[in-house]
Amino acid sequence: TNSQITWKLQGEYSAKFANTHEVEAMHRTEIRKTWYKSISANGYGYDRKTLQTKPVIFPNETWAKLYPLYNESYVENAFASFFATGSYTFKQRYTLGGSVRFDGSDMFGVAKKYRFLPLYSVSGLWRLSDEPWLEETEWLNNLALRASYGIQGNIDKNTSSYVMGDYQNVTILPGNTEEMISVSTPPNSKLRWEKTKTFTAGVDLGVLNNAINLSVDFYTRNSSDLIATQLLTLESGFASMLVNWASLRNTGVEISIGTRNIHTKDFMWMTNFNFAYNNNKVLREQIPENQTTPGREGYPVGAIFALKSAGIDDEGYPLFYNKQGEKVTATELLKLNAAGASN
């Protein structure tokens, strides 16, 4: 069964003074709790041919535990959000806006300071087409410059701040099984939100009675505290763990062009063109030397790597260059990569 309780409270304010000043504000609070309970039962001894069920007698208690008749699981999470937005416009030409958001979740570290993340954004717009020195330009309907900056947060639901283990029955000696819990993930009391800081600058243009509209956006996104693999010393008992420490940068441009080609009472023809370019780079990451996923430091995410060929040897086997620029066979290269991964 899935259950959820949500409590929301919202307030809005809007006012206009002397056709010059416009003020808008909004506040909202949301508290949500979800829980999931699963119960399953299994039966043994059913014969599909006779459509009858025969009792199954296990030779001992250990064997019976390998085939449980009843399973139950329970998951519970809580979220809280508090946010507000506001904007001020002067003479319908200059607009300043901002927002503040405070999100919290019990999915993060034991320390309370990691459970909440303050988010914010600021933005501005200058509508040049309404300026007196451009107002008389008949072919220009809209020309606006805008910019924004803000920070966003993300939850990785595949991680946990607590010790994770697998309960299982293992065979120690022939005919004998033991119950055990295998620890698969070490605890992480500092697990926290993934953060992304975004700066965007854009321009909007509309001409010829808005028959042609153009929007261009340039953006830079710097992501930090990303959940990524960090190698650990062997003394810890784990080879690696997922922690907040990787960083990534995205830069790009997005262009949108819309045209109204024909517009009559019986027929309308409009076209839209979109172009987007994005370039990303892993700024901080740590993975074994012989791995390339999810991304190597200094390269784009999902970059494709290839070995530099050095031709073939006298017997026709391929040769490759190692890091020192020496020619090695494929077998030698694999041994070097394996040694580098273990080191």
Question: Where do the model's predicted regions map?
Answer:
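Extracellular/periplasmic, surface-exposed regions of secreted and cell-surface proteins
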Residues: 1-309
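Short aromatic-centered micro-motifs
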Residues: 88, 320-321
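A generic structural motif
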Residues: 288-289, 325, 334
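Short, intrinsically disordered, charge-balanced linker/junction segments flanking boundaries
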Residues: 330-343
